[in-house]
């Protein structure tokens, strides 16, 4: 599916973590596909740059500085998006972080809390705040950006793995709860992508990751995100779509 086909023409997409990496790539791809894109992140300079790049190619975008660990900030994000574009059709829950890179025995509880606050509670806050707006549209899409580590775990990465496992379960529960409202909820697993988080796990080198894995650029994730966002109302829900070559 090519972005130039304008498959998302007129739709409004809110994307968290849109200032860099996968979130930024999806924001640019959705804009090229005709969506009005609301770029959310903690760092305003980064999402301002994303918006500038979208507008430079004739796209429509809005930057909203957001801290996904604060429910008030998340609520304001969706109020602002709706006031500006008239509603919300798509939510991409992408904001993520990893502050714990030690064994459970040696880990810092505060690092665990910070990781789960962003990856799991942040996802819950976004879904909780977005659902009323999606219902008003009569249908919608929620895409959670998960991780293979949430399905199989990773030594010295317990907090991140547990947060993504929780996100996958949240995805499945949301899909069941929102099925009557024609709101589909699916997980997108990018696999190994050259981003800050991936580099933390591999020390910046694919040699330290799975040798036969496909080491992607953020842009390589966009086609799958477009596919999920463009599915019909009766399309798949409660599913996990992965770009990994293997699951262990």
Summary of predicted features, one role per range:
Residues 127, 163:
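Active-site helix of classical SDR
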Residues 33-49:
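Conserved glycine-rich Rossmann-like NAD(P)H-binding loop of the short-chain dehydrogenase/reductase
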Residues 180, 187, 208-248:
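C-terminal helical subdomain
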Residues 102-104, 108-113:
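Substrate-binding pocket helix/loop in short-chain dehydrogenase/reductase
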Residues 147:
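Residue(s) in the substrate-gating loop at a strand-loop-helix junction
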Residues 12, 19-21:
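Conserved glycine-rich cofactor-binding loop
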Residues 132, 176-177:
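Alpha-helical segment proximal to the catalytic Tyr-Lys
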